[in-house]
């Protein structure tokens, strides 16, 4: 497979609404513009629950959040957004792994013979990623038993995922995350929506 890698720079992460600063055990960076958006300042956990942020009333100063946790969740979610963008542009793409890294994120992508992704294609992939972000798709999580998980990935043409699930115990339950039309086998966590 071809590895597509992106680097993400995160600067001074915080969640702030006026004089309210939000933080939690597994935080995510979001610039919250109004109180209605507060419900979206969360991370979607594999058990399907939102991990809420804790409000700290102070003088409006920015609270520091654990950089490594913020960065990991954003990068991990960005990898899923990139995979969805690639799948839209290259429907035959087959994905292996796509984790967050210390410098960004990547996804191993297998394409049919004669189809290649080069640096010249990156602007189109980035543009599609921006569309997905604008669509503000919700990350949802669901579980399936091993046999159903294999069937789902076979139906979607994901041979590497089928192979990986096939290596798991017969009684395994597999976690999937979905945003819009894209579904990936994943243990999470992720941001709640593609648009921060």
Located regions from the model:
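N-terminal catalytic cores of NTP/NDP-binding nucleotidyl/phosphoryl-transfer enzymes
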Residues: 59-99, 185-192
């Amino acid at each position: 497979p071809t590895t597509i890698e992106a680097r993400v720079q995160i600067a001074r992460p915080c969640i702030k609404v006026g004089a309210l600063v939000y933080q939690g055990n597994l935080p995510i960076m979001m610039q919250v513009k109004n109180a209605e958006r507060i419900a979206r300042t969360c991370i979607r956990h594999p058990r399907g629950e939102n991990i809420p942020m804790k409000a700290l009333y102070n003088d409006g100063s920015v609270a520091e959040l654990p950089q490594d946790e913020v960065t990991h969740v954003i990068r991990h979610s960005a990898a899923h957004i990139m995979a969805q963008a690639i799948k839209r542009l290259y429907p035959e793409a087959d994905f292996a792994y796509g984790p967050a890294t210390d410098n960004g994120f990547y996804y191993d992508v297998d394409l049919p013979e004669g189809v290649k992704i080069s640096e010249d294609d990156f602007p189109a992939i980035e543009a599609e990623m921006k569309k997905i972000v604008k669509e503000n798709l919700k990350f949802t999580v669901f579980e399936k038993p091993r046999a159903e998980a294999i069937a789902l990935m076979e139906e979607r043409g994901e041979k590497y995922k089928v192979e990986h699930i096939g290596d798991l115990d017969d009684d395994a339950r597999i976690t999937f995350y979905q945003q819009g039309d894209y579904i990936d086998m994943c243990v999470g966590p992720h941001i709640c929506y593609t648009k921060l």
